[in-house]
Amino acid sequence: WVLALPGQWIAGVGVLVRSITMATEPVVDAGSGMNPETFTAAVAKLDPHGRRFTSLVPAQLARLLGDPRSLVALQSFDRILVGGQAAGRELIAAARAAGVSVTTTYGGTETAGGVVWDGVPIGDTSAAMVDGRIHLRGSSLADGYLDDAERGAVAFPTLDDGLRWYRTDDAGRFADDGRLVVTGRLDDTIVSGGIKLDLLEVAAVLRGMPEAGDVAVVAIDDARWGQAPAAVVTGTVDEASARDALVAALGPAASGLRVVHAGSVPRTPTGKVDRVAVAALFG
């Protein structure tokens, strides 16, 4: 296994545990932030005759696919687990078309990592939908949160079936073939001016504007609208143009849009958008 994620994160712990279970020594990508050069160097240290595995977040996968050296390294793996954030269908399709064996995973710290692979619960995991919210159950569930019984009671309710479940913050549905489809975070839906607005749709519209560049959207409190979408962009699009495009596509709920320009979108060490840092840009 190649450890390309922080070892203190549940996905990183998963890599270490799996490596130990397989009686192998993990190779640690010790670069200052994972990049194609350090990843390729780490892969070169693997046993050339052994099976190869790693876990990545989508942002890492996208970056590695774009470099010829790391693409060859990716192609050498038997399986690459991709999780930690929503992986777009286009990214997964591009990876598979390039000969990279990827498996999408879904879960969290509360489930000891990914427990749904390519939409199918693994082991004794079960998935259920309650009012559009994904719930997960299985032997890997956490007992609760340290010194926070109240939070644990909310996150791990006993449902009508008498069983204990983990109540996620994600919306989803089951596809016709029974696979679980994660459609977004429930906190990605806000009420702005009395109208519901999906921040994922806001981001999608902005990303469709070539002059927007990289985009991240969060919700901020607004005296007029209650809540408003706030976007950090790396391109040159101005706030008025972005607002006009959003209102045309999504309606008046997008009228409160705020935009700030930045050299890059703030991200966590694993490549997720740092929502707290993005919101801080708006004071």
Which positions does each model-derived feature cover?
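AMP-binding/adenylate-forming
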Residues: 2-63, 103
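Gly/Ser/Thr-rich phosphate-binding loop
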Residues: 66-119
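A structural signal for short hydrophobic beta-strand segments in well-ordered beta-sheet cores
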Residues: 127-129, 153-156, 170-174, 217
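AMP-binding/adenylate-forming catalytic core of the ANL superfamily
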Residues: 138, 163-164, 171-254
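AMP-binding/adenylate-forming catalytic domain of the ANL superfamily
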Residues: 251-273
